[in-house]
């Protein structure tokens, strides 16, 4: 066993002063637990005796801690406990996804709260079972930290699909304080996750409410001048006009693509932002200056709700004519316009009557 090294984090809870220990993961965890290579078609949402952790779910569905009792896991079709007796997971096991199409390879979960359920680890996974006592949740959060994952990045292999080997995982370093400090850290991050889940549910509820109100607070057309639902102080009939009467396309000549400060319209109504590669591009591509308050959309992503109002901080940034921008004329409010065009019945109808295939429709300004 190698000599233990000590380290101290920059931020820690008050009352703890002891140095942290540093060890190779292969020294403190057993990697001999069996996994299976069952594909998705061998799994079912119906309950069988043995449930399975698939690497794809680790990468996309599960957080750092997998609460088995309160999470729906796929079952292995026709499985019995005797078939997998030597592969059953235990409380506190760490399960790594050893393959991915990007740098998420090595993402892991700490498995907790079995409550009698029988769970095994599946395709493209590696199980690390702690050989020493760790506080609940501590390892799960540690191994999903940026500091730990940065150790994995140079150890990845492959081009189109990246992978990490069991030997390389064993060579990575884990750090840990005393058990009482581990308990405080684990509980802290667990509480944060629960808070995030609570707010996510509230957010989902508000999104559903907004979706319903967008259907009811605009007239449905076909000669209907009144919305189904409106604020009580307003009783006048709504007017119906062509959108072009309220906006004028802006074509202020800007820079070429190699020097333009670029902006882009995010999908699904998530606003207008600067591009990460702000100054990269072709010197042959012409860009146009955009102004704060203009309405802008993506021609190729019209069906993906690529609409926005340019914010003040992006005043003077540029886009090509594939993301045209419009000055809004008197008589229309920019936020009202944005909500109006963000309704599914609007952008789906306009997109479906446009020319081009479903995957490559370019919605022109006229």
Language model feature labels by segment:
Residues 1-17, 201-236:
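Short amphipathic coiled-coil heptad-repeat segments
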Residues 12-36, 171, 229-253:
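Non-catalytic DNA-recognition/assembly elements of restriction-modification systems
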Residues 13-14, 185-196, 231-232:
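Hydrophobic structural patches
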Residues 22-23, 198-200:
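Amphipathic, low-proline, heptad-repeat alpha-helices and/or compositionally biased low-complexity charged/polar-rich
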Residues 29-176, 244-366:
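DNA target-recognition domains and sequence-specific DNA-contacting regions of bacterial/archaeal
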């Amino acid at each position: 066993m190698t000599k233990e090294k000590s380290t101290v984090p920059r931020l820690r809870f008050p009352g703890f002063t002891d140095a942290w220990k540093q060890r190779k993961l292969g020294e403190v965890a057993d990697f001999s637990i069996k996994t299976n290579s069952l594909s998705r078609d061998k799994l079912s949402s119906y309950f069988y005796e043995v449930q399975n952790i698939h690497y794809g779910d680790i990468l996309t569905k599960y957080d750092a801690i997998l609460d088995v009792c309160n999470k729906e896991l796929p079952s292995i079709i026709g499985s019995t406990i005797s078939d997998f007796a030597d592969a059953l997971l235990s409380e506190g096991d760490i399960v790594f996804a050893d393959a991915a199409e990007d740098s998420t390879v090595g993402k892991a979960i700490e498995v907790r709260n079995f409550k009698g359920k029988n769970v095994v680890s599946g395709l493209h996974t590696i199980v690390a079972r702690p050989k020493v006592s760790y506080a609940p949740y501590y390892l799960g959060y540690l191994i999903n930290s940026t500091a730990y994952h940065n150790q994995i990045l140079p150890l990845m292999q492959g081009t189109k699909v990246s992978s990490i080997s069991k030997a390389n995982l064993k060579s990575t370093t884990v750090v840990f304080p005393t058990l009482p400090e581990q308990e405080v850290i684990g509980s802290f991050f667990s509480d944060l996750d629960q808070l995030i889940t609570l707010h996510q549910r509230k957010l989902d509820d508000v999104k559903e409410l907004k979706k319903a109100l967008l259907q009811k607070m605009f007239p449905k057309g076909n000669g209907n001048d009144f919305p189904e639902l409106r604020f009580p102080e307003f009783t006048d009939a709504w007017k119906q006009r062509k959108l072009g009467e309220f906006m004028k396309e802006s074509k202020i000549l800007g820079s070429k693509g190699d020097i333009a400060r670029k902006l882009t319209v995010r999908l699904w109504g998530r606003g207008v932002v600067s591009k990460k590669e702000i100054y990269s591009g072709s010197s042959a591509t012409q860009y146009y200056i955009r102004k704060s308050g203009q309405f802008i959309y993506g021609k190729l992503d019209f069906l993906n709700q690529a609409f926005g109002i340019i914010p003040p901080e992006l005043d003077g940034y540029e886009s090509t004519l594939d993301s045209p921008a419009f000055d809004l004329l008197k008589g229309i409010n920019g936020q009202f316009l944005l909500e109006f065009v963000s309704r599914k019945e609007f952008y789906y109808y306009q997109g479906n009557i446009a020319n081009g295939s479903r995957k490559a429709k370019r919605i022109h300004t006229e």
